[in-house]
Amino acid sequence: MEKDWKLFKKKLGGWQEAYMDRLIEEYKDILNSDASSFDKYCTLRKKIYDDYKSPSVLARDVSRSNMFIILLGLLRDEAITMDDLDGFSDELKEDLQQLLK
């Protein structure tokens, strides 16, 4: 489990950055749409508010005990895939897969 924790701490920031890059592209699409300025603003505001609550944007209480929950949130948000968990223990990956079914 210690190996998983060290790998998690090493990768979390990169995963979050990549997810935020994807969100920024989605925000650009909203801003570049043909909608009215008001509709763009409302849509963008709601999306940013919803995205902010995602563990992929802001992982709260990063600790060994919360690592599993954060990984599950990242997978559910499609910020990462099971392939991104290469190097993590088989036990951890199997436990995550069970909950994703």
Where are these regions (language model features)?
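Acidic, Ser/Pro/Thr-rich low-complexity regulatory regions
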Residues: M1-K101
